[in-house]
Amino acid sequence: MTAETAAVDARPVASSQRVGVLLVNLGTPDALGYWPVRRYLKEFLSDRRVVNTPRLIWWPILNLIILTTRPQRSSKNYETIWNSQRNESPLKTVTRSQAEQLAGSIVSGEFGAGGDIVVDWAMRYANPSILSSLQRLREQGCGRVLIVPLYPQFAGATTLSVADKVEESLARMNWRPDMRSVPPYYNDPVYIDALAQSVRAGLAALDFEPEVVLVSFHGIPKSYVEAGDPYYDQCVETWRLLRERLDFSPERCPLTFQSRFGRAEWLSPYTDETVKELARKGVRRMAVLTPGFSVDCLETISEIGVENREFFIEAGGEQFALIPCLNDSALGMKVIRHIVSRELEGWI
């Protein structure tokens, strides 16, 4: 027997009944500082699903301009939200907690299958990687794997990019378990209800009553939607259903898109411009929620909670609040347990 054969034989035999559940979020630098942030940005911005500019044009822009200037600035932004105790960003802290709580629900018998379900978590970019997490599931004998992209609304740059990486990783591993993936849950009643409850609780905790409760989604280039990406329509539907549940008019609860990058036209109206415009028109009290993010991160805590707050105050606003994402709260975990339980039907 060769050493290679022995290594193969030593692998755990997959149980066709054991299910691996893999929660996946976007990603975060492994540490603060120029080089860790640069590595993260390079992986992220090299993804053709994220930036589909021809490589001959994009390579020099990315490597000679963006990756020489942006890492230092981004690192300073990450410093403001960094979990110094764990030396990681909140995105990693909370996603780990979501996986641990989901695993705890399984152990307690909520899914009725006990040890036949293994839960892990991964990031699309940086660590823990999708490849390493799939390897752990294989080592634990999983013969079935459910991928859970933590993106309520589908976008090629997020959901489809996760699918690409999963396929690439499985090919590298020469492994083909039975596979399922959680579909977008942008209109799921459990998700909408959790958002509504979270917004009500967030507003009730404020010491002021917002005149405007703005809903901000991450933007994508308009050309992606024109090419068929359903992201915009799904964001609009989430916004509509949430407004109906809260009994808010479009004027009280406008829809915007944030985080635009580069010179191309992105989905609009833009969050930063809307915040300034509303303040200039006399709005003095505002709250913002970001229902497309399952976990608070740089784009919510810093971009909305700090940068857009400053825009609002500088333009004449007085009171501004960021309503937290669902995160690993009881409401957030209710959504995750619901979508996982639904997609595991027939497997457990």
Swiss-Prot record:
One of its GO terms (molecular function) is metal ion binding. Belongs to the ferrochelatase family. GO terms for biological process: heme biosynthetic process. Keywords: Cytoplasm, Heme biosynthesis, Iron, Lyase, Metal-binding, Porphyrin biosynthesis. Catalyzes the ferrous insertion into protoporphyrin IX. The lineage of its organism: Bacteria, Pseudomonadati, Pseudomonadota, Alphaproteobacteria, Hyphomicrobiales. PANTHER family: FERROCHELATASE, FERROCHELATASE, MITOCHONDRIAL. It holds the Pfam family Ferrochelatase. This is Ferrochelatase. Pathway: Porphyrin-containing compound metabolism; protoheme biosynthesis; protoheme from protoporphyrin-IX: step 1/1. GO terms for cellular component: cytoplasm. CDD domains: Ferrochelatase_C, Ferrochelatase_N. It is found in: Cytoplasm. Its EC number is 4.98.1.1. Fe cation binds at residues 218, 299. It catalyses: heme b + 2 H(+) = protoporphyrin IX + Fe(2+).
